[in-house]
């Protein structure tokens, strides 16, 4: 999974209101050009020293601010259950002692099936302290998947020695079907019929080993800290090796770039899943490294889920806020309508950060307007470029030039290499935050690095100013998604996709671009049901079939598609036919991740009949045609 924003031709709306000043380490690079067209970007500022192991920072804060809240979660739907830095350290040492006694290792790691929680964090940091890798898995693999295909695959790939799910009752079917009889199951509570289940409380009650400090001291920069799963074009998970060096170096990169983190410990209200690098490395690591406090948000940017996020933000004022574009879009109407929420949200907010897709100009400008209304200034909106394989922080914008589609420059410690590739500039990365490889997949690992040891992200960039690369770079799509029309003309999918979504707002959440070896480009459209209800308020909240057939929705989409066609500059940007898809994208088939990222290739493969329908000589009524 890449954590980059998609490109967008639509600029952020101009504003005369001031930008809140924040401490920020603007990246500046030295540039080297080779005769073959390859360009190297090397940050002028060297990376500062970083610790050997992430638990060194846990020791630091447990000593200097032992009673500060590290993490809090809702308890019984009302108050907050909190754990301090001192309590986290103590629990980690007990759990580590229990894990070491079990002989767990990289060959027999800990696998965590359930989502974000304090208990999840306790087990994860216990594994960190023991030097035993752990792997957080998307709960959807256990609770949404119908055939457990991905879960079964990764169990064979990882061969865990202990599998944890906070609620054993909830995960019982998945545990029974996928965890071998010789593998230990652990849980905070609940049962699995026919299986013994170790309680987390028992793990936490393990006496601290006499040699624990010695074992902990042997953890080095190359010790595997965790595995994070990412899916390729096949949809089968790859386990990205995350070493202590990667995680620790990346946190120093973050702290030196987002320098306002040094001004005061961050307070974060966060829902982003820990099985992804954005939530699990970037955010939880940023909290720990800088002595901050993370309030776990059980909400999500979906109908029936955003209300919990709103409730949490009505109580807790974040100093920095992280989300995906859909999260900001879902939050926007509540911020607009509730002055109390707006005041609480912007009260001490230094910056916002988005990743995963393009943030629409409408949403961005609206957030600016609300901040100005409340505080008299705009709050910086930040983004960048990264991937699971880069831990993830690799490139960053600066607050003054930030806009959707802009990814800035490589941060200290990272060298970027730009390689000509079919008329684009493919970006590659080298630094201490880059993975050593994929676990037990040497062939895929070898193909992921070039002859100089640069990791191939698969992304393309283009300079904002070809004469001044220090002006930064814009995202220019995924190299593997681009294709040729029958005429031989290249279609740049990433930028086209972002422009299409922006032009069809608020109706469209995402789009799959089709047209390989065809005469023209067409689209399979993923509707945004919230946006559709803005067009027709009578629509049900969760009926995709009704929405795709609704007359008002189809007319509104046709109008937007017609305008989009009118702005086309050639065959590679002309979309004349589209189908509004009436079945959800499938996690089992690898069409979409649990965070909502679409695998274009998988959708095109599994929905080939829809593609044929788009290009039929006599298209069906489902096809919306213009031009």
PLM feature segments, named:
Residues 89-95, 207-210, 221, 240-261:
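Conserved structural elements of the adenylate-forming
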Residues 141-177, 209, 250-269, 302-319:
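Conserved ATP-dependent adenylate/AMP-binding module captured primarily in the ANL superfamily
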Residues 81-86, 216-218, 225-252:
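Conserved AMP-binding A3 loop
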Residues 71-122, 142-152, 200-205, 242-245, ...:
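Conserved AMP-binding/adenylate-forming core of the ANL superfamily
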Residues 202, 290-292, 310, 319-322, ...:
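Gly/Ser/Thr-rich phosphate-binding loop
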Residues 248-267, 274-343:
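Conserved AMP-binding/adenylation subdomain of ANL enzymes
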Residues 425-485, 623:
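Conserved ATP-binding/catalytic segment of the ANL
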Residues 66-69, 186-188, 192-229, 236, ...:
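Conserved pre-ATP/AMP-binding loop-to-beta segment of ANL
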């Amino acid at each position: 999974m890449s954590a980059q924003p998609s490109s967008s031709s639509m600029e952020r709306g101009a504003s005369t209101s001031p930008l809140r000043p924040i401490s920020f380490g603007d990246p500046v690079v030295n540039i080297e050009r080779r005769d073959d067209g390859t360009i190297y970007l090397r940050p002028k500022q060297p990376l500062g020293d970083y610790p050997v192991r992430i638990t060194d920072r846990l020791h630091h804060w447990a000593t200097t601010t032992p009673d500060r809240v590290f993490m809090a979660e809702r308890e019984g739907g009302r108050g907050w259950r909190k754990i301090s830095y001192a309590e986290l350290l103590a629990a980690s040492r007990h759990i580590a002692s229990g894990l070491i006694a079990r002989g767990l290792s990289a060959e027999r790691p800990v696998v965590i099936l359930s989502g974000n929680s304090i208990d999840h964090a306790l087990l994860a940091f216990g594994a960190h302290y023991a030097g035993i890798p752990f792997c957080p898995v998307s709960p959807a693999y256990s609770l949404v998947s119908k055939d457990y295909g991905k879960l079964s695959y990764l169990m064979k790939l990882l061969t865990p020695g202990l599998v944890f799910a906070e609620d054993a009752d909830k995960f019982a079917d998945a545990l029974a079907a996928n965890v071998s009889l010789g593998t230990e199951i652990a849980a905070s509570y609940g049962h699995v019929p026919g299986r013994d289940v170790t309680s987390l409380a028992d793990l936490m009650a393990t006496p601290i080993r006499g040699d624990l400090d010695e074992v902990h001291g042997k953890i080095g920069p190359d010790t595997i800290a965790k595995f994070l799963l990412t899916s390729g074009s096949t949809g089968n998970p790859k386990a990205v090796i995350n070493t202590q060096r990667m995680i620790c170096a990346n946190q120093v990169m973050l702290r030196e770039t987002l320098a306002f983190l040094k001004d005061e410990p961050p307070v974060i209200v966060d829902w982003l899943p820990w099985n992804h690098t954005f939530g699990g490395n970037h955010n939880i690591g940023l909290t720990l490294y800088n002595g901050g406090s993370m309030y776990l948000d059980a909400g999500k940017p979906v109908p029936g889920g955003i209300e919990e996020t709103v409730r949490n933000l009505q109580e807790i004022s974040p100093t920095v806020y992280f989300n995906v574009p859909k999260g900001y879009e879902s939050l926007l109407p509540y911020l607009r309508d509730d002055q109390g929420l707006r005041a609480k949200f912007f009260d001490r907010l230094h910056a916002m950060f988005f990743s995963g897709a393009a943030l629409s100009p409408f949403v961005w400008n609206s957030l600016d307007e609300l901040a100005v209304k409340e505080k008299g200034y705009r709050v910086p909106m930040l983004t960048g470029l990264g991937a699971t394989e880069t831990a993830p922080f690799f490139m960053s914008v600066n607050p003054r030039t930030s806009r959707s589609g802009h990814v800035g420059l490589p941060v200290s410690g990272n060298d970027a290499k730009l390689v000509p590739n079919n008329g684009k500039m493919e970006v590659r990365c080298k630094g201490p935050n880059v993975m050593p490889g994929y676990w037990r997949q040497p062939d895929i690992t070898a193909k992921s690095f070039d002859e100089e040891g640069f990791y191939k992200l698969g992304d393309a960039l283009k300079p904002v100013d070809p004469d001044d690369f220090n002006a930064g770079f814009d995202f220019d799509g995924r190299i593997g998604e681009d294709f040729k029309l029958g005429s031989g003309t290249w279609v740049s999918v990433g930028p086209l996709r972002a422009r299409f979504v922006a032009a069809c707002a608020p109706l469209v959440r995402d789009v799959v671009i089709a047209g390989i070896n065809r005469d023209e480009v067409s689209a399979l459209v993923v509707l945004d049901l919230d946006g559709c209800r803005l067009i027709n308020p009578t629509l049900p909240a969760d009926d995709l079939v009704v929405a795709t057939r609704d007359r008002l929705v189809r007319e509104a989409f046709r109008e937007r598609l017609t305008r989009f066609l009118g702005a086309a500059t050639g065959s590679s940007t002309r979309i004349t036919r589209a189908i509004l898809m009436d079945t959800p994208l499938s996690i089992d088939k690898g069409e979409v991740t649990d965070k909502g990222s679409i695998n274009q290739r998988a959708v095109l493969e599994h929905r080939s009949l829809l593609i044929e329908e788009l290009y039929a000589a006599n298209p069906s009524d489902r096809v919306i045609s213009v031009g």
